[in-house]
């Protein structure tokens, strides 16, 4: 299980990303529309002044039950280890084990 501080840090990043999402998106649209290089540099400086953790690239998917940041399945929101355990216990409807 992931440490509580790492899970809280990830939640803080999600809140920051939601808070600055519109500002970041509008600034990126402005950069593509402005023809002069000086204006682009000013807008780029505005983007750089935003908090680093507000960038969407810094977010990680985490397992819903354990908080593990690796080997996550998007469809379920679980890590592979927990997904396998839940399928074996028949806790996920519609999921079947493969056999060939």
From Swiss-Prot:
Pfam families: Ribosomal_S14
Residues making up the signal peptide according to the UniProt record: none
GO MF term list: rRNA binding; structural constituent of ribosome
Its biological purpose: Binds 16S rRNA, required for the assembly of 30S particles.
Family per record: Belongs to the universal ribosomal protein uS14 family.
Protein's organism: Morus indica
InterPro entries: Ribosomal_uS14, Ribosomal_uS14_bac/plastid, Ribosomal_uS14_CS
Record's protein name: Small ribosomal subunit protein uS14c
Location of this chain's protein in the cell: Plastid, Chloroplast
Quaternary state and interactors: Part of the 30S ribosomal subunit.
Keywords assigned by UniProt, alphabetized: Chloroplast, Plastid, Ribonucleoprotein, Ribosomal protein, RNA-binding, rRNA-binding
A GO CC term assigned to this protein in UniProt: small ribosomal subunit
GO biological process assignments: translation
Keyword Ribosomal protein: yes
């Amino acid at each position: 299980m992931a440490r509580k501080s790492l899970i809280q840090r990830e939640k803080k990043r999600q809140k920051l990303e939601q808070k600055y999402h519109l500002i970041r998106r509008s600034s990126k649209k402005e950069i593509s529309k402005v023809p002069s290089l000086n204006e682009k540099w000013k807008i780029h400086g505005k983007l750089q002044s935003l908090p680093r953790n507000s960038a969407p690239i810094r977010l990680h998917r985490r397992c819903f039950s354990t908080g593990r940041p690796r080997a996550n399945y998007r469809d379920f929101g679980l890590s592979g280890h927990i997904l396998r355990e839940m399928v074996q216990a028949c806790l996920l409807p519609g999921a079947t084990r493969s056999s060939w």
